[in-house]
């Protein structure tokens, strides 16, 4: 069996789907708004 080598990179993840990136675009703001409305504890990554 081979090892699972994918670890995930936090910097990359933040750059793609962090809070500040979400606030940049209209659709990103909509995502945050929807998640607030649903009562999510984590709005973004």
Swiss-Prot record:
Basic residues bias spans: 10-45
GO molecular function: structural constituent of ribosome
Recorded superkingdom: Bacteria
Keywords: Ribonucleoprotein, Ribosomal protein
Record region (Disordered): 1-45
Pfam families in UniProt: Ribosomal_L34
Cellular component terms per the entry's GO annotation: ribonucleoprotein complex; ribosome
Record has Ribonucleoprotein as a keyword: yes
GO biological process, one term: translation
InterPro entries: Ribosomal_bL34, Ribosomal_bL34_CS
Family indicated by similarity: Belongs to the bacterial ribosomal protein bL34 family.
Entry protein name: Large ribosomal subunit protein bL34
Gene transcribed to yield this protein: rpmH
């Amino acid at each position: 069996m081979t090892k699972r080598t994918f670890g995930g990179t936090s910097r990359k993840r933040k750059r793609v789907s962090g809070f500040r990136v979400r606030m940049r675009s209209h659709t990103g703001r909509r995502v945050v708004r929807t998640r607030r409305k649903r009562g999510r504890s984590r709005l973004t990554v």
